[in-house]
């Protein structure tokens, strides 16, 4: 009985269809394992690993570089230390408000990563403004440190009337971040307007920027203002940070909305191809019998097609360059505004007075028909998983650039140098 069963099994395994399934099964296991290793950072992948995805990798290196950079410029003596400041005619004004945090403080790493590795031409084109947004700025651990005066173009606390200052103190005491956050954002925008810079970059004090962020951003802005791809006066901001949590398969995607059709097409195409091969190459008929074709079309092709969907949309179709992001954009970690759009935006924020700043900007863009853009891949990471606004950690974890940590430092450095050396980029740095 056992011998008969074994012979039947061996006979079955000797069939072409069984051999195809065995080989395909082995290939599928290899592909599945590769996907587990390669796509575990995509939050909408079947291989997402939430246990390890928030560990710093590239951000940790940049934090060390940033802190080393600021520590060099924090020496007690001025001897041997050159101030690294911008000019009075910047191409970009970068501004951030910083407050004392109860736990982790990333302000120094934010400023350091913003400035370290900048070419002198890049630094001269950038005006950096820092607002200490505690009504008592001496509470902040970085207030008064020497590196600020040597690296930052404008360091300030509130320069407002007594009445406004008392109101800010009340907001601070009441933890009214919805109103004070909007006030600070408007304050920064107005500060940058005074510099005359054509672009205004507002970022938060708990981010880490990648090597080469400035030249890549200016290159993207050049595309938006020159040539056949110009979008003058039609966009409100260029986003340097976005999170992949918003970039999932949705009903807007044709092949996701029509997934049954996708499976039928690949299965039908595979079947047609195999039948065509069997018809024109008689030598294949013994192998390509009906059972083999059925195994390929009904098992193998659907399995590998399903694996593609399981990878996640962003893993399969990563963004590159300047792209529209009108729907899935999130948060205000790093937005670059064209100067001409800022006065009207300031007026709207002052009118609304309080709320979630990012939602208010999105609402304004919807009402005015202005396009929201993003520079891909992300140029900064939001490392402040503990919010300064009493937000839940589970909410701040969703504000994470998952693939940012896969950046290769050597590759980014080489790319930065290549972009600086390219003759067609001299326009933005001379």
Feature names for model-found ranges:
Residues 2-57, 258-262, 266, 270-430:
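C-terminal catalytic/acceptor-binding lobe
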Residues 89-98, 114, 126-130:
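Hydrophobic targeting segments
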Residues 96-109:
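Active-site beta-to-alpha loop of glycosyltransferases that engages the nucleotide-sugar donor
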Residues 110-125:
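Short, acidic, metal-binding catalytic loop of nucleotide-sugar glycosyltransferases
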Residues 133-199:
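Active-site-proximal specificity loops/subdomain of glycosyltransferases
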Residues 196-208:
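Short beta-strand-to-loop acidic/aromatic patch adjacent to the donor-nucleotide binding site
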Residues 211-242, 246:
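Conserved donor-nucleotide/metal-binding helix-loop-beta segment in metal-dependent transferases, i.e.
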Residues 232-270:
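Cytosolic-side membrane-insertion boundary helix
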């Amino acid at each position: 009985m056992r011998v008969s069963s074994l012979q039947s099994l061996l006979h079955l395994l000797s069939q072409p269809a069984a051999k195809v399934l065995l080989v395909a099964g082995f290939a599928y296991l290899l592909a599945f394992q590769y996907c587990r290793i390669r796509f575990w950072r995509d939050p909408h992948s079947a291989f997402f690993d939430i246990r390890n995805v928030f560990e710093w990798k590239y951000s940790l290196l940049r934090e060390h570089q940033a802190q080393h950079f600021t520590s060099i410029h924090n020496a007690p003596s001025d001897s041997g230390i050159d101030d690294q400041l911008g000019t009075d005619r910047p191409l970009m004004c970068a501004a951030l408000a910083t407050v004392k945090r109860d736990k982790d403080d990333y302000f120094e790493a934010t400023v350091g990563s913003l400035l370290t590795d900048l070419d002198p031409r890049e630094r001269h084109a950038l005006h950096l403004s820092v607002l200490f947004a505690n009504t008592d700025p001496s509470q902040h651990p970085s207030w008064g440190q020497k590196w600020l005066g040597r690296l930052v173009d404008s360091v300030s606390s509130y320069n407002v009337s007594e009445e406004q200052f008392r109101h800010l103190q009340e907001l601070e005491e009441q933890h009214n971040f919805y109103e004070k956050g909007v006030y600070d954002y408007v304050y920064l925008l107005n500060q940058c307007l005074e510099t005359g810079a054509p672009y205004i970059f507002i970022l938060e004090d708990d981010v880490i920027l990648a090597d080469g962020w400035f030249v890549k951003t200016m290159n993207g802005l050049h595309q938006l203002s020159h040539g056949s791809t110009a979008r003058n006066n039609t966009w409100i901001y260029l986003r340097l940070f976005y999170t992949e949590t918003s970039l999932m398969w949705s009903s807007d995607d044709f092949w996701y909305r029509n997934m049954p059709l996708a499976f039928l097409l690949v299965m039908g195409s595979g079947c047609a191809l195999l039948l065509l091969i069997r018809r024109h190459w008689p030598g294949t008929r013994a192998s390509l019998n009906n059972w083999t074709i059925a195994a390929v079309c009904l098992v193998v092709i659907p399995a590998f097609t399903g694996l593609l969907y399981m990878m996640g949309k962003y893993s399969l179709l990563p963004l590159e360059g300047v792209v529209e992001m009108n729907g899935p954009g999130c948060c205000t970690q790093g937005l670059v505004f064209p100067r001409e759009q800022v006065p009207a935006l300031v007026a709207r924020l002052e009118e609304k007075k309080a709320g979630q700043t990012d939602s208010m900007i999105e609402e304004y863009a919807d009402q005015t028909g202005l396009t929201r853009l993003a520079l891909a891949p992300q140029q900064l990471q939001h490392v402040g998983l503990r919010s300064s606004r009493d937000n839940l950690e589970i909410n701040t974890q969703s504000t994470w650039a998952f693939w940012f940590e896969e950046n290769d430092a050597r590759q980014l450095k080489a790319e930065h140098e290549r972009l600086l050396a390219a003759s067609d980029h001299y326009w933005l740095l001379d």
